Amino acid sequence: MAITAAQVKELRDKTSVGMMDAKKALVEADGDLEKAIDLLREKGMAKAAKKGDRVAAEGMTFVAVKGNKAAIIELNSETDFVAGNAEFNDLLKAVANTVVEMAPADVEAALALEVEAGQTLNDKIIGTSQITGEKITLRRFAVVEKTDSENFGAYSHLAGSISALVVVDGASEEAAKDIAMHIAAIAPQYVSDAEVPADVIEREKAVQLASEDLAGKPDNIKEKMVEGRIKKFLAEITLLDQAFVKNSDQTVAEFIASQNGSVKSFVRYQVGEGIEKKVTDLAEEVAKQLG
């Protein structure tokens, strides 16, 4: 199949390999981006690429807590300048408080909620857009519930560019916040290895088995080396197996155990993750404005 320049660019952006290497991998993978990434990794030419590495939209994330419910939201704007102003921040908190109180099923349902007489949440967002001169959108949210014996931990990093919300059982709010801080900083994908889907593990195993540095090694040696690499891979993506950000001498599992608690669930949002950023040529923009 024909490989486009856009496909080559996307693969290069995700793996930092040369143009010809990217094109060859895409040809071999019949244009499948994820398969091409795996092929490059097998050749030792690219580091593991995470989906959604390219961050695009501006905006902020925020966590609102009300009793046994909490909501984490992402509100997007076109520029970080608007994301930092008072009108946007007021809207951010208003949206989060509405979502945590009403617990809508999805974004569409949230936008239809009546927040004031005759005014929906969408109307409120549009009103702020008119004030700021930029398009503002509610991209996503999650509403999380806990029991009376559990605690929420919430943490926002870099002025709201990243937020994390965690539920712990048995441990204090302070311990929960420390774990939320870890989640914001280290970005685990799952609580424990038991949550990692089998296909994710099988894919990683296939990549490692095909690695060129294992070629020619006896099967029993190869199997042991791959087993070790899978263990390392799981430790990198699962919260409980990661070195605790506040004390690298212990894992998160060891920390929460020392607090007589356990981690039930978590949500982590980073502004714009998974959305490709529009790159603007400043000189071209100025030229257009000058006519």
Curated annotation (Swiss-Prot):
- Disulfide pattern: none
The UniProt entry lists the main location of this chain as: cytoplasm
A single Gene Ontology CC term: cytoplasm
Top-level taxon: Bacteria
Sorted alphabetically, which keywords does the UniProt record give?
Answer: Cytoplasm, Elongation factor, Protein biosynthesis
What InterPro entries does the entry give? EF-Ts_dimer_sf, Transl_elong_EFTs/EF1B, Transl_elong_EFTs/EF1B_dimer, Transl_elong_Ts_CS, UBA-like_sf
> What's an example of a GO molecular-function annotation for this chain?
translation elongation factor activity
Localization, per the record, is:
Cytoplasm
* Positions of the UniProt region annotated as Involved in Mg(2+) ion dislocation from EF-Tu: 79-82
Family to which this protein belongs: Belongs to the EF-Ts family.
What NCBIfam families does the record point to?
A: tsf
Q: According to its UniProt entry, what is the function of this protein?
A: Associates with the EF-Tu.GDP complex and induces the exchange of GDP to GTP. It remains bound to the aminoacyl-tRNA.EF-Tu.GTP complex up to the GTP hydrolysis stage on the ribosome.
The cross-references to PANTHER family, in alphabetical order and at most eight, read:
ELONGATION FACTOR TS (PTHR11741), ELONGATION FACTOR TS, MITOCHONDRIAL (PTHR11741:SF0)
Task: Tell me what this protein is called.
Answer: Elongation factor Ts
Which organism is the protein's source?
Answer: Leuconostoc citreum (strain KM20)
